Structures are given as C-alpha cells and as structure tokens.
C-alpha cells in the first residue's frame, strides 16, 4: 500500500493513491475532534467520492503501520460508517468515509450519542 502524506488543517492525513482511502493515526484523530476549525477545513477539501470497492463485499484491510488485519466496526453509534481500526495505530477510512464521519461529528453526532 503506497500512502502519500497530506497536511490539511495542520494535521497529517495519509492517502492511498490507488483507492483514495485515508489513514489517520489515533493521536491525529483525537486532535481533529478537538478542533472545530480543523474539522471544517477537512470537510471543505476532502473528496466525497463513493468507495469504488464497496460493491465487492466486505474487505479486511491491513494496518499500514504493522500490517495486521484491522478490525471492522461502526465509527460511533449512529454514524452509519463502518471503519477499519487498528487499536495500536489508527483508523483506515475507505474513500468518502472520513468526510462522512466529519459531517456526523459536525452535526453533533458524538455529543448526541454521549448524552443518551
């Protein structure tokens, strides 16, 4: 997997040039979620293309850091986005998933589910 690092909103997001997926470390994701301005900037620049591999069924992705198969799970209750997650290194977002998660967060999705 060939990843290119992109600096967007002061955070590093790694992008796969083949499938347009994104890898975000756990630390970077926490930083994104703590700053509304970063969320807004990422939402403005990230492509919202659909995942070209979605019709192929469930595909397990290897972590680009440790090459262990990542776990699939819903990002957060109510998000309707299934991510690939390495508990040691971060989150893999298929093409279009990171903007969908950021839309969910910007709409108060994390707060809404935390209060219920």
PLM features: residue spans?
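Short Cys/His-rich "knuckle" micro-motifs
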Residues: 3-8, 26-29, 71-76, 94-97
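Short, flexible, mixed-charge glycine/proline-rich loop motifs
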Residues: 5-10, 49-62, 75-80
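Intrinsic disorder/low-complexity detector
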Residues: 34-58, 110-116
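Short metal-binding segments enriched for Cys and/or His
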Residues: 21-38, 90-107
């Amino acid at each position: 997997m060939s990843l290119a690092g992109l600096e967007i909103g002061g955070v590093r997001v790694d992008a796969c040039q083949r499938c347009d997926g994104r890898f975000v470390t756990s630390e970077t994701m926490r930083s994104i979620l703590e700053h509304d301005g970063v969320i807004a900037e990422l939402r403005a620049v990230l492509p919202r293309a659909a995942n070209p591999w979605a019709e192929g069924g469930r595909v397990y992705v290897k972590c680009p850091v440790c090459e262990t198969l990542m776990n699939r799970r819903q990002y957060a209750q109510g998000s309707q986005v299934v991510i690939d997650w390495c508990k040691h290194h971060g989150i893999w977002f298929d093409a279009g998933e990171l903007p969908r998660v950021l839309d969910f967060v910007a709409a108060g999705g994390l707060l809404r589910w935390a209060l219920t």
